């Protein structure tokens, strides 16, 4: 989940079906995370950042590698069989075949996310954003065509990056005109 910088596929499903094969509606994108979570899970395997900048650096490295490989494939200096699965995934994100569903709370992390969008031309959906307390940040997301899946509303501010979390922040989102939906994040987060 959100402890990984790149966590896996995000899909849209039907919750109540007779046959689990009917549950899958469509692939939505790839789950990614910025901020506190990826740097807080130090016991997990793989390349782990110890700072927010470190998490962004790992994302950028993967995008740069994928962009270089795309160019080599276009010039036939590489064949698709030589591409590892993670780089192939990042090439799908770069070509906008997949969106990134990014776990992000803080305004500064959102600004970094907007820079990644500008640098690599990727499509993103911002998940959470509950620490955003200024309308300008939601307006910047709207200007970059980033929809928001907002929430959970009125959850306990259980980590430092949620110090501005308030159900009142939803007004800033609404006033910005950004596209959004509301999430419960159930059963991960207890509500007040």
Please name every model-derived segment:
Residues 17-20, 122-126, 147-150, 170-173:
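Short, surface-exposed linear patches
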Residues 3-6, 133-134, 157-158, 189-191:
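Short secondary-structure capping/turn micro-motifs that flank functional sites
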Residues 1, 103-105, 128-130, 151-153, ...:
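Active-site-proximal beta-strand/loop segments in catalytic clefts of secreted hydrolases
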């Amino acid at each position: 989940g959100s402890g990984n910088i790149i966590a896996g596929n995000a899909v849209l499903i039907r919750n109540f079906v007779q046959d689990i094969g009917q549950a899958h509606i469509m692939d939505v994108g790839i789950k990614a995370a910025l901020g506190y979570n990826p740097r807080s899970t130090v016991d997990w395997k793989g390349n782990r950042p110890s700072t927010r900048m470190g998490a962004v650096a790992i994302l950028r490295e993967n995008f740069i590698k994928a962009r270089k490989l795309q160019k080599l494939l276009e010039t036939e200096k590489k064949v698709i069989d030589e591409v590892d699965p993670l780089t192939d995934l990042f090439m799908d994100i770069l070509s906008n075949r997949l969106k990134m569903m990014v776990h992000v709370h803080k305004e500064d992390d959102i600004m970094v996310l907007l820079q990644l969008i500008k640098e690599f031309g990727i499509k993103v959906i911002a998940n959470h954003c509950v620490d955003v307390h200024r309308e300008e940040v939601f307006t910047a997301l709207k200007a970059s065509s980033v929809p928001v899946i907002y929430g959970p509303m009125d959850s306990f501010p259980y980590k430092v990056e949620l110090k501005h979390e308030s159900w009142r922040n939803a007004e800033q989102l609404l006033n910005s005109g950004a596209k959004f939906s509301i999430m419960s994040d159930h059963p991960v987060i207890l509500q007040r």
